[in-house]
Swiss-Prot record:
Cell compartment(s), UniProt: Secreted
Domain of life: Eukaryota
Entry GO terms, CC: extracellular region
Listed name of the protein: Venom allergen-1
InterPro entries: CAP_dom, CAP_sf, CRISP-related, P14a_insect
Organism: Aedes albopictus (Asian tiger mosquito)
Keywords (A to Z) from UniProt: Glycoprotein, Secreted, Signal
């Protein structure tokens, strides 16, 4: 089994008949074209003929959210040698972010898009992961949970000093998926997942998760302080250390 995980930014396109924004609006993207602008609705050639979206039903959403929040709570409570977080929100699901993620996922190419912003979230971030295997009966929920844990495991290589200021450059193993996962200006996530067959027998799962905030160079990953001390809506009784699901934070740069 081969595993690859990666994190970055992504965003997407318009729902037919919905009130979502025009993703071709140049004001949404400074860094390049929006992934959802005039995006094709069909699957990409790399997906082959045997491909499908994994249904993002309530069970799979719950697995993704619970895994994210369990791991965020570990950092908020000061585990793994990291300082406690004063205001780490509970992640909740966002359908627009998930829809936008589908435009990356449907390409079946493991690569970040250049822009995935929405009207509300102008600094949207992204994590990607893919696995290819043969001869195993892995389920989508198991893969999603494993992917999220692999992102989090990058904490082993992340210097604690990065909590105060995300670096402009980093030498060594990847740490960006972990820092994206525990960013305290992120409070929503939406994901899309593809299942496709290559070379006649190789099974692939490709997961794309979009977040309300990305890593910002020179800015804190999260604000240090006594666990939950700055939560404005109290703490989450299920994921102790996180702010309640009602907590709303500004997903924007400190520098405007």
């Amino acid at each position: 089994m081969a595993f690859n995980g990666i994190a970055l930014l992504i965003t997407a396109t318009i729902f037919i008949g919905s009130c979502y924004a025009n993703y071709c609006d140049s004001s949404l993207c400074r860094q390049g074209p929006h992934v959802a602008c005039n995006a094709p609705q069909q699957f990409g050639p790399a997906c082959g003929n045997n491909r499908k979206f994994v249904p993002m039903d309530s069970k799979l959403k719950t697995i993704i959210l619970n895994t994210h929040n369990k791991l965020r709570a570990e950092i908020a409570n000061g585990k793994h040698g990291f300082p406690q977080a004063a205001r780490m929100p509970t992640l909740v699901w966002d359908d627009e972010l998930a829809h936008i993620a589908s435009f990356n996922a449907r390409k079946c190419i493991f690569a970040h898009d250049k822009c995935r912003n929405t009207r509300q979230f102008k600094f949207s971030g992204q994590n990607l992961a893919i696995t290819t295997f043969y001869g195993f009966n892995f389920q989508a929920g198991d893969r999603a949970e494993n992917f999220t844990q692999e992102w989090f495991n990058e904490h082993k290589d992340c210097p604690k000093s990065y909590v105060d200021a995300y670096p402009s450059s980093h030498r060594g193993p990847q740490i960006g998926h972990f820092t994206q996962l525990v960013n305290d200006r992120t409070w929503k996530v939406g994901c899309s997942m593809m299942h496709y067959i290559t070379n006649g027998k190789m099974i692939n799962y490709y997961l794309v998760c979009n977040y309300t905030m990305t890593n910002m160079i020179g800015e804190p990953i999260y604000t240090k302080g006594r666990t939950g001390s700055k939560c404005e809506t109290g703490q989450n009784p299920q994921f102790k250390g996180l702010c309640s699901p009602r907590e709303r934070v500004k997903s924007e740069s400190y520098n405007g």
